[in-house]
From Swiss-Prot:
One of its GO terms (cellular component) is membrane. Monooxygenase; part of the gene cluster that mediates the biosynthesis of chlorflavonin, a fungal flavonoid with acetolactate synthase inhibitory activity. Within the pathway, cfoE is responsible for the chlorination of the flavonoid skeleton at position C3'. The pathway begins with the PKS-NRPS hybrid synthetase cfoA that uses benzoic acid or p-hydroxybenzoic acid as a starter unit with four rounds of chain elongation using malonyl-CoA to form the chalcone skeleton. Its EC number is 1.-.-.-. This is Monooxygenase cfoE. It is found in: Membrane. The chain crosses the membrane at residues 549-569. Disruption phenotype: Impairs the chlorination of flavonoid at position C3'. GO terms for molecular function: flavin adenine dinucleotide binding; N,N-dimethylaniline monooxygenase activity; NADP binding. The gene is cfoE. Keywords: FAD, Flavonoid biosynthesis, Flavoprotein, Membrane, Monooxygenase, NADP, Oxidoreductase, Transmembrane, Transmembrane helix. The keyword Nucleotide-binding does not apply.
Amino acid sequence: MRVAVIGGGPGGLTTLKHLLEAHKFVGGDPVEAKLFEAEEGIGGTFLKRMYEDAELVSSKYLTAFSDFRAREDDPDYLPAARYLEYLGEYATAFDLWPYIQLSTTVTAVRRKGRSHVISYATQDGKEGSWLCDAVAVCSGLHVTPNIPSIKGIDKVPKSFHSSGFKSREQFGSDTTVVVLGTGETAMDIAHLAVTAPTKRVVICHRDGFSVVAKRTPSPVVFPSLASQLQSPNPPVPVDTYLHASHKWGNLPGNVFDSLVKQGMWLMTGTSAGYDQWVGGYPSPRWHTSNVIFTKSSKAMPYISKPYRKDTILQRLRSSIVQVPIPETHGRHIDIAPWPSHIDSEGVLHFIDNGRPEYKRMEEAEVVRPDVLVFGTGYTQRFDFLDSTYPSTSDLDVRDVWRRDEPSVGFIGFVRPGFGAIPPLAELQAQLWVLNLLAPERLQPLLPQDEPHYRLGMPSDARIKYGVSHDDYANQLAVDMNASPSFMDAVRIGSSRKEWWRLPLVWLLAAEFNTKFRLCGPWKWDGAVDVMSGELWDVVKRRGGLLKQIVLSGVPLVVFGSLHLVLWIFTSLFKPSRW
């Protein structure tokens, strides 16, 4: 079988790797695979869109591929440049380079009988074609900038999309900077702007957002005794233990939603987000299973500063427990509704959203931006595919392929509400390759097993491909018979001296991809070492018994009890598949 991979980002690299290694795991003849990458190097968006102080928003423990881990001395959150280096090391470790064609743009994909013809052009002007049996589209979510139309934008001296942002120097000095959007990149840019020699920084949102901390907050209990009570352990990446809701109805998700909101209120005084006193989602939409969190919180102290409440209740709460609030050195970021237009004088006008920020901006000095940055995300285009091919909106099998076109897979086109795309792309690649080569080894891929992992996005949302990371990852593993049970973890770990480590990591940690290499068609001998070593150390970092109970014990007891009841119910009444 010959397979073309389009795109050399994380999704393309892991797809190429699994194609080349498939015969070792599922048998059969080796696959002939070739990866086409338009740029001069691999890495996708991490190659083209690095900017000052950029780092991953997901930890190295979650983001790293299952069988190629980040270095022990790497920080928890890799700088973008280091992650790019990691991808190069991955390609070297699995000998992918001979199968990668750099500086080669795929110009068209067309059908020839049951096969596909890849037409391509190199940067030096050469053209060619390659006949193959299957195509993996891995061109990435973050390629074509999404730039909304704003009347009067030509009145702003300098405007550009965040894809063109590199450093603070682009803001200039004594300038008014406006950032449109509240995603991670927009928040990073707003923080860089407010810590640069600018005059004023404004950030605009459409209909709310929710910021969460990447690292577990370290609240001070009874601040007057802080020096005695603060934990000596470094903060733990949140995505190494976050528990998602599961497929058995809404009750577990509602309990989790309540725990998250109450926890944020207890530590920061607000349940809208991490130290987020303004700009939250409207109540009907604000549920943890319905949103994509913003995992960049450095700008939040500057945004919340004018809105932070000083009531008797807040004073009482903060005297008992409080996350330290970073110093803003007298600066703040104005938050505003989405702009309606820019007038002939270059003044920005805002849509009246009925929120406190609109009233405050109406009473404040007019906003006349010198620099406007569109932190408004990206759209997906597949101009190289002709009209007979599916697009991402047509995918009806695990958001990877269309049921009547299994030879064309789309890898990496989901967005986790809290998590990382690369590990999900790895699981997608495993599922798609297995379906190509040994479909009999899969469980039935039923449509009714999909709604539970989808985020409940509103119909007018720009992003319609949101998923719950843990639920989606586990579903793909279940499809491949690669999701070990707790008793599997006990059995597999029983041969080791520290036999308890593996089952405890199974219980207390997130859905790391390495967990799904303990068994199944992609079983890897090194999985036990990673789970019982590196990932055990992460779980152990949480500190004492109290923190373990709060971070893992409470969710385990709550969700475990709910699932025990459901298990008894299904055992007694044996309903059909949910």
